[in-house]
Amino acid sequence: MIILSGGTGTPKLLDGLKEILPLEELTVVVNTAEDLWVSGNLISPDLDTVLYLFSDQIDRKKWWGIENDTFRTYERMHELGIEESMKLGDRDRATHIIRSNLIRGGTSLTEATVKLASLFGIDANILPMSDDPVSTYVETLQGVMHFQDFWVGKHGDPDVLGVDIRGVSEASVAKKVLEAFEKDDNVLIGPSNPITSIGPIISLPGMRELLKRKKVIAVSPIIGNAPVSGPAGKLMQACGLEVSSMGVAEYYQEFLDVFVFDERDRADEFAFERLGCRASRADTLMTSTEKSRELAEFVVGLFDTVC
């Protein structure tokens, strides 16, 4: 199975999938449009979250970073008057140093990610969407800013006017991702932010055509008229989409076969048929590992119903 993932929402579903499927059968294609260089090192927030999840290092209270990490380097730099745009843990920083040294030595982001997965003892296939630089910028009333500045620096507070995924039209789908699509017919779009997490992946040249030839199931990150977490609602509005499960399904409709939305959502299950897809209700909140596993089992079972 191929899973398209950002750094929030989908990792909880991955937590369930890794309990019910052989790890070597999972290929996670991860958004890299939120990557940025901090203090000379390349930070890949979404990739790191997925790597830490599959290596059982993730801080499950925050669902990012490494559990029980320390912040001595960050604090020392602050003492010396050097401000970093992200609060990086010491062990987390080691990941960034290894990645950056590999890339400076001529290694691709894919190769660096495979190396990190090996160092962490991960059997699943964790891949960046592309080896080319892609960056998401958010146009706000306070000016244009990198997504990390908007979300981490400004806490997602500025009003959003638009979203620009820079470099995506010139980028290529990573070779190993293409190889995965040649071998697997089942694609799951996780409940990550459709605009800034999944959007960059499906905007890569040729990706939509690949998805049209596969069985595609998506899980909604929206319940009612609000996202489960993060700034998806504000970003969807700026892109002209209704903030609802229907709005998410419309965004994916050209390649979507089955759409899973929350059982608490009042949306009409049959209304999705006009988009050319089926819809199924489930508990999508994933408040525990057991709930994640239950949703994973439900979604995996749906693939057998797709022709």
Curated annotation (Swiss-Prot):
UniProt: 7,8-didemethyl-8-hydroxy-5-deazariboflavin binding residues: 48, 87
Enzyme class: transferase
Known role: Catalyzes the transfer of the 2-phospholactate moiety from (2S)-lactyl-2-diphospho-5'-guanosine to 7,8-didemethyl-8-hydroxy-5-deazariboflavin (FO) with the formation of oxidized coenzyme F420-0 and GMP.
Enzyme nomenclature, EC number: 2.7.8.28
Catalysis performed (reactions): (2S)-lactyl-2-diphospho-5'-guanosine + 7,8-didemethyl-8-hydroxy-5-deazariboflavin = oxidized coenzyme F420-0 + GMP + H(+)
GO biological process terms, semicolon-separated: F420-0 metabolic process
Record-stated family: Belongs to the CofD family.
Official protein name in the record: 2-phospho-L-lactate transferase
UniProtKB keywords: Magnesium, Transferase
Pfam families, A to Z: CofD
Pathway(s) served: Cofactor biosynthesis; coenzyme F420 biosynthesis
Organism of derivation: Methanosarcina acetivorans (strain ATCC 35395 / DSM 2834 / JCM 12185 / C2A)
Key word Magnesium present: yes
GO molecular function (one): LPPG:FO 2-phospho-L-lactate transferase activity
S-S pairs: none
Cross-referenced CDD domains: CofD_like
Domain of life: Archaea
InterPro entries: CofD, CofD-like_dom_sf, FbiA/CofD
Cofactor(s) this protein cannot do without: Mg(2+)
Subunit structure: Homodimer.
HAMAP family named in the record: CofD (MF_01257)
